[in-house]
Curated annotation (Swiss-Prot):
Location of the protein in the cell: Endoplasmic reticulum lumen
Gene: crtA
Sequence repeat feature ranges: 191-202, 210-221, 227-238, 246-256, 260-270, 274-284, 288-298
Naturally occurring in which organism (per UniProt): Dictyostelium discoideum (Social amoeba)
Source organism phylogeny: Eukaryota, Amoebozoa, Evosea, Eumycetozoa, Dictyostelia
3 X 11 AA approximate repeats as annotated region, ranges: 260-298
Entry similarity comment: Belongs to the calreticulin family.
Protein name per the record: Calreticulin
Signal peptide coordinates: 1-19
Length: 424
């Protein structure tokens, strides 16, 4: 048993040692020497600026990525690496993205491109080999997997809706294998897998309808016909759809001079049977649904190398973001799933817990600040109300004192008049 485990370990180490990493980037301080920002939309001022940052919350402040920093802008940046073919090997594309802005409309996908890419002119029309990653806009949330086959871009037929929309870092992984299968993983968990031929319309149909065949003119495909022996009953069409309500009575206060001649209301006729239609019977001439004969499609050619990309030489982001704030990092292009997993453990996994804790602490602090602000506002409003009530009370007291003073003056006046009168 121990020998078997040792052999398995040696095979793993051997395969790991033979793996090739075509591209890897964690965006150190020298990242701009490897990445080229496109001139796309610079003239019209719609090109967004990328900044080098770990963001507002992180697991490791030294693990920085590139962040979109301006809203409603286009972003296009790329890096090149030695051209390679994935013939006979797995192709693994992996990267992380953190949408600090709580994205509501914007792409966060990555592209693998051919080596001929003109980096300064890189834009939405540039040819690419693979486009992969999340895209969010309103209610639409999906992971794109678009493959270029023979010069045409093909979107995966299945909806991959497992898009993380919180404000933490998430990792997206695409694996394409020589047996023409694929896997999509989010945070190292498989969310989609299948066969390239089944899940993309890369190949034309094996069979097509024979263009030389058409349904015979005498083909009967009507299942039922009217019963020729069924006859419409006499007087059927004479029955009206509505009749005068026999229970209706002219109101006692009805005045024909003022109200006009009274007419009884009508009701649906219970005897009315609607438009007469003959009963249906099975059609004795019915031959069934005509099926168009199929022939082999002359355009179809089997391809056992749907997975193959002969010239991969660049990687890049070409995005439109309504709301900026996405941070991209930890990219790897390799032929080894194990290599990608190891890279993930050292970068993404190692910082997940610490990043979430920092985020939660910041959110808790914000909540506490909001609570204090609300309490302060409530206290200020209560103080204002109390002051208003005190002012109103003072005004009432002042009015009462004024009335009392006026009453006293009136009494003095009356008393003076009385004295004067008595003296007279």
């Amino acid at each position: 048993m121990r020998l078997l485990l040792c052999l398995i370990f040696l095979v793993f180490v051997f395969n790991f040692a033979l793996s090739t990493v075509h591209f890897k980037d964690t965006f150190d301080n020298d990242w701009e020497s490897r990445w080229v920002v496109s001139d796309w939309h610079k003239e019209d001022g719609k090109s967004g600026k990328l900044v080098h940052t770990a963001g507002k919350w992180f697991g490791d402040e030294n693990q920085k990525g590139i962040q979109t920093s301006e809203d409603a802008r286009f972003y296009a940046v790329s890096a090149k690496f030695p051209s390679f073919s994935n013939k006979g090997k797995d192709l693994v594309l992996q990267y992380t993205v953190k949408n600090e802005q709580k994205v509501d409309c914007g792409g966060s996908y990555i592209k693998l491109l051919p080596s001929k890419l003109d980096q300064s002119a890189f834009d939405g029309e540039s040819e690419y080999s693979i486009m992969f990653g999340p895209d969010v806009c309103g209610a639409s949330k999906r992971v794109h997997v678009i493959l270029n086959y023979k010069g045409k871009n093909h979107l995966i037929k299945k909806e991959i809706n497992k898009v993380e929309t919180d404000q933490l870092t998430h990792q997206y992984t695409l694996v394409i294998s020589p047996d023409n299968t694929y896997k999509v993983l989010v945070d190292n968990k498989e969310i989609q897998a299948g066969n390239l031929a089944d899940d993309w319309e890369l190949l034309p149909s094996k069979q097509i309808k024979d263009p030389k065949q058409s349904k015979p003119v005498d083909w009967v495909d009507v299942k039922e016909i009217d019963d020729p022996e069924d006859v419409k009953p006499a007087g059927h069409d004479d029955i009206p759809a509505s009749i005068v309500d026999p229970e209706a009575v002219k109101p006692e206060d009805w005045n024909e001079e003022d109200d006009g001649e009274w007419e009884a209301p009508t009701i649906a006729n219970p005897e009315y049977k609607g438009e007469w239609k003959a009963k249906k019977i099975p059609n004795p001439e019915y031959k069934g649904e005509w099926v168009h004969p199929l022939i082999d499609n002359p355009e179809y050619a089997e391809d056992n190398e749907l997975y193959l990309f002969n010239d991969l030489g660049a990687i890049g982001f070409e995005l439109w973001q309504v709301k900026s704030g996405s941070i991209f990092n930890n990219m790897i292009v390799t032929d080894s799933v194990e290599e990608a997993k190891d890279f993930s453990e050292k970068t993404f996994v190692a910082n997940q817990e610490a990043e979430k804790k920092m985020f939660d602490d910041l959110e808790a602090a914000k909540a506490e600040e909001r609570k204090k602000a609300d309490e302060k506002l409530a206290a200020e409003k209560a103080a204002e109300k109390e002051a208003e009530e005190a002012d109103e009370e003072e005004e009432e007291v002042a009015e009462e004192d004024l009335v009392k003073t006026d009453d006293k003056k009136e009494e003095v006046k009356k008393s003076t008049k009385k004295v004067d009168h008595d003296e007279l």
